[in-house]
């Protein structure tokens, strides 16, 4: 019971800390840069964190993910790049292992199918429960994956993975993954509404 309350308290505290950090980043225009990265307007490859992941990112196994649609408007490649960057920024801010967080972020969805087209057979786990383990297996076949990175990958869908994340960095990706997915789904919609508003404003002015 004590462990449960400690874990719940830790999660609530981490949520508050990440929320505060994202608010600070927003005020510093950093989140706007990340939204641009989601839409490929910002060359994320020129950012400092790229040195931590370049060997993984440039591999053919990762580049293949650019052909697979993910979260409606983007690709798996773009998504994992976004997650890797947010992992790096947040973990670096809190003094966690930002390098491993970034590298694991780039491997956390290492699977080669469109989740919307996947046929679930009787007895198989759902995509949400299955793909973290598959991604970890695929990553270990190609890259050197540390115990920390492995835990980040297999636990990134917690609580759907049931077992508690073992490291602080593993909790970070739980929230970062969802946050990036939200950005990826909402950003194109926001841009569409913004463009429509600007168009209407121009027409009204004329």
Residue ranges of predicted features:
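Metal-dependent phosphohydrolase cores
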Residues: 9, 13-206
């Amino acid at each position: 019971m004590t462990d449960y309350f400690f874990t719940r308290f830790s999660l609530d505290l981490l949520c508050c800390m990440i929320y505060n950090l994202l608010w600070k980043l927003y005020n510093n225009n950093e989140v706007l840069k990340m939204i641009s990265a989601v839409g490929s307007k910002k060359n994320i490859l020129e950012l400092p964190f790229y040195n931590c992941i370049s060997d993984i990112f440039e591999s053919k196994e990762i580049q293949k993910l650019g052909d697979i649609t993910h979260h409606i408007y983007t690709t798996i490649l773009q998504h994992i790049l976004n997650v890797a960057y947010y992992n790096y920024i947040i973990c670096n801010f809190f003094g966690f292992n930002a390098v491993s967080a970034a590298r694991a972020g780039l491997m956390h969805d290492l699977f080669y199918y469109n989740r919307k087209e996947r046929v679930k057979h009787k007895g198989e786990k759902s995509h949400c429960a299955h793909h973290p383990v598959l991604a970890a297996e695929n990553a270990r076949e190609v890259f050197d994956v540390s115990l920390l990175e492995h835990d980040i990958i297999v636990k990134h869908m917690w609580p759907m993975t049931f077992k508690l994340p073992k490291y602080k960095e593993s909790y970070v990706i739980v929230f970062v993954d969802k946050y990036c997915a939200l950005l990826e789904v909402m950003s194109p919609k926001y841009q569409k509404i913004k463009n429509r508003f600007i168009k209407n404003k121009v027409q009204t002015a004329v």
